[in-house]
């Protein structure tokens, strides 16, 4: 039996044990993991350094190296996310709804774990911690399959998690890592319907599209983040500048950073040149339409491909429009249904934007950078769903549960 199949079979067995664990037992395990991560920070960083050095040797981009990199603060941030998770209410066993039928049957809809969660992801080793802990909190076994670029970091983190779980009542194999990072292991994971209840891809568009196209296992799609900010003609200048600079430059390599600004022509006539200059001073490369080029000759002419690209770098597309309807059309045409924002003082336009734009998270006068489980108060997240079935947006605890109906009677039979 190969590695993927063996770990799938084991996860199915473990899932039946985890469903019996109490909230207290699960929280004790999470606390142990947080403590062990701090205790073994030096070991994790040493292994992460190997991934970084190999990445540099292979010519990885700065944005990819940033997603790959761990440091003491990022590990502290992981543990803070776990502590938030401990404080959150355990959804397992929660009564979603209850009612009584005329025949005396009492019906309850109860939250239950999904069972076995498969997680396939790229680069970011912090996802290893997020996925493991949020699955444990919700009573799910998890099989992790990271990329070859982060294999040293992922193996170290899972080893640390196993050492933590050894001190608790939860089985070490509640969290398993597929160490084979070849395409064959991924393809096998795609079709493990007998063992996986759901598969969650988290990474670039190519990975996500491949999983959605090839998997026979049910998929919770976490989409790429081709996010936009629309600056309406009534937008406050300083607010617009602050939001765009934050949403693009604070951390350009993440999915909730913006990739296109859509400017109303009337606003751009007054403030566009100054905004472009401010962005360029911060190292942002601008790619715009002909109207943007007419305002600033240093802007590169955008290609059709640019409008649909998640750059994950200091590259920003610029589109000028004459109306909110044109802005909405552009966003719905090229957006990835992740996060979209409008900066405006016109409530009618804001309402139109919220009703018409199709995305998991919509913002008025705020940065798209807040689309994140911790910022939403969910604790660690397992991803940001851009699909419409089961769950949408940052996926916190309830996203990793299903429901079942519990019916109590006193001898009723159907007539």
UniProtKB/Swiss-Prot annotation:
Enzyme Commission no: 1.2.1.41
Main location (coarse class): cytoplasm
Keyword Protease: no
Class in the EC hierarchy, top level: oxidoreductase
PROSITE patterns listed in its UniProt record: PROA (PS01223)
Keywords: Amino-acid biosynthesis, Cytoplasm, NADP, Oxidoreductase, Proline biosynthesis
Cross-referenced Pfam families: Aldedh (PF00171)
Protein name: Gamma-glutamyl phosphate reductase
Organism: Bacillus cereus (strain AH820)
Gene expressing this chain: proA
């Amino acid at each position: 039996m190969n590695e993927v199949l063996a770990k799938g079979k084991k996860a199915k067995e473990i899932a039946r044990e985890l469903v019996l664990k109490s909230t207290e037992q699960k929280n004790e395990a999470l606390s142990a993991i947080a403590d062990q991560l701090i205790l073994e920070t030096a070991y994790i960083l040493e292994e992460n350094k190997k991934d970084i050095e190999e990445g540099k040797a292979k010519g990885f981009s700065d944005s990819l190296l940033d997603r790959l990199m761990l440091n003491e603060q990022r590990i502290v941030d992981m543990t803070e996310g776990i502590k938030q998770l401990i404080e959150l209410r355990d959804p397992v066993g929660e009564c979603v709804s209850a009612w009584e039928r005329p025949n005396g049957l009492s019906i309850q809809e109860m939250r239950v774990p999904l069972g076995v969660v498969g997680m396939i992801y790229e680069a970011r080793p912090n996802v290893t911690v997020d996925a493991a802990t949020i699955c444990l909190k919700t009573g799910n076994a998890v099989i992790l399959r990271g990329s070859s670029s982060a294999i040293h970091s992922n193996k170290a983190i899972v080893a640390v998690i196993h050492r933590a779980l050894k001190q608790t009542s939860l089985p070490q194999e509640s969290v398993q890592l597929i160490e084979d990072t070849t395409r064959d292991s991924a393809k096998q994971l795609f079709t493990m319907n007998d063992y996986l209840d759901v598969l969650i891809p988290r990474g670039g568009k190519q990975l996500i599209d491949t999983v959605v196209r090839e998997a026979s296992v049910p998929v919770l799609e976490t989409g790429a983040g081709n996010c936009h900010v629309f600056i309406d003609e009534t937008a406050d200048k300083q607010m617009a500048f602050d939001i765009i600079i934050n949403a693009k430059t604070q951390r350009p390599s993440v999915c909730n950073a913006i990739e296109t600004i859509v400017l109303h022509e009337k606003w751009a006539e007054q403030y566009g040149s100054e905004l472009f200059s401010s962005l360029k001073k911060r190292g942002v490369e601008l790619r715009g339409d002909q109207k943007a080029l007419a305002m600033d000759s240093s802007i590169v002419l955008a290609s059709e491909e640019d409008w649909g690209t998640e750059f994950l770098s200091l590259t920003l597309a610029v589109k000028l429009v004459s109306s909110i309807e044109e802005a909405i059309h552009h966003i719905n045409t090229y957006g990835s249904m992740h996060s979209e924002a409008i900066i405006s003082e016109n409530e009618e336009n804001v309402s139109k934007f919220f009703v018409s734009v199709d995305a998991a998270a919509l913002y008025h006068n705020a940065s798209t950078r807040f689309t994140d489980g911790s910022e939403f108060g969910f604790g660690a997240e397992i991803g940001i769903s851009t699909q419409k079935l089961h769950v949408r947006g940052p996926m916190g605890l309830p996203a990793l549960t299903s429901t079942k109906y519990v019916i109590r009677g006193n001898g009723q039979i159907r007539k």
